[in-house]
Amino acid sequence: MTNGMIRIIGLDPGLRRTGWGVIEAQGTRLTYVACGTILPPENAPMAERLAELHRGLAEVLARHAPDEAAVEETFVNMNPSSTLKLGQARGVVMLAPAQAGLSVAEYAPLLVKKTVVGAGRAEKAQIRMMIGVLLPKATPQTEDAADALAVAVTHAHHRGPAALRRAAL
């Protein structure tokens, strides 16, 4: 982008639903571009679901041409099988923008919540409400899309050499 403007895609990885949100940042000014949710077929074999997730992300990346990507880190839950499946989806979510030539930064959920809401233990409803305040034209239809916009906002606030170096490791 020109004039110091950068287009950022935020991604909230999931095997059932992956949220994406695109914003433009110029200095401290943030502008909503688009958001949505990719829904791989739930009853399809794992490889097919991952392939559909990749296809959907590649389409979004081609349509919105972001300059940088940011992905929310995932947490390990009590069910090892669920954690492994989420890890596979997260791998695809990180791969697609990297294949498109983008740097991919990662942010912990706690930092995303603290950046957007001001509290690391914020609820989903608080995140969605603050996204409406920060990006008045945004109309995320799912929590996943709202979370993805929150990841993009976090990247806009925390990006820079350190975040991009972490992404390159």
Swiss-Prot record:
The keyword Transferase does not apply. The keyword Iron does not apply. It comes from the Bacteria. Its cofactor is Mg(2+). Keywords: Cytoplasm, DNA damage, DNA recombination, DNA repair, DNA-binding, Endonuclease, Hydrolase, Magnesium, Metal-binding, Nuclease. It catalyses: Endonucleolytic cleavage at a junction such as a reciprocal single-stranded crossover between two homologous DNA duplexes (Holliday junction). Its EC number is 3.1.21.10. The active site is at D12, E72, D144. Mg(2+) 1 binds at D12, D144. GO terms for biological process: DNA recombination; DNA repair. One of its GO terms (molecular function) is magnesium ion binding. Mg(2+) 2 binds at E72. GO terms for cellular component: cytoplasm; Holliday junction resolvase complex. Binds 2 Mg(2+) ion per subunit. InterPro entries: RNaseH-like_sf, RNaseH_sf, X-over_junc_endoDNase_Mg_BS, X-over_junc_endoDNase_RuvC. Its main location: cytoplasm. Gene3D superfamilies: Ribonuclease H-like superfamily/Ribonuclease H. It is found in: Cytoplasm. Belongs to the RuvC family. The RuvA-RuvB-RuvC complex processes Holliday junction (HJ) DNA during genetic recombination and DNA repair. Endonuclease that resolves HJ intermediates. Cleaves cruciform DNA by making single-stranded nicks across the HJ at symmetrical positions within the homologous arms, yielding a 5'-phosphate and a 3'-hydroxyl group; requires a central core of homology in the junction. The consensus cleavage sequence is 5'-(A/T)TT(C/G)-3'. Cleavage occurs on the 3'-side of the TT dinucleotide at the point of strand exchange. Homodimer which binds Holliday junction (HJ) DNA. The HJ becomes 2-fold symmetrical on binding to RuvC with unstacked arms; it has a different conformation from HJ DNA in complex with RuvA. In the full resolvosome a probable DNA-RuvA(4)-RuvB(12)-RuvC(2) complex forms which resolves the HJ. PANTHER family: CROSSOVER JUNCTION ENDODEOXYRIBONUCLEASE RUVC (PTHR30194:SF3). This is Crossover junction endodeoxyribonuclease RuvC. It comes from Azorhizobium caulinodans (strain ATCC 43989 / DSM 5975 / JCM 20966 / LMG 6465 / NBRC 14845 / NCIMB 13405 / ORS 571). The lineage of its organism: Bacteria, Pseudomonadati, Pseudomonadota, Alphaproteobacteria, Hyphomicrobiales.
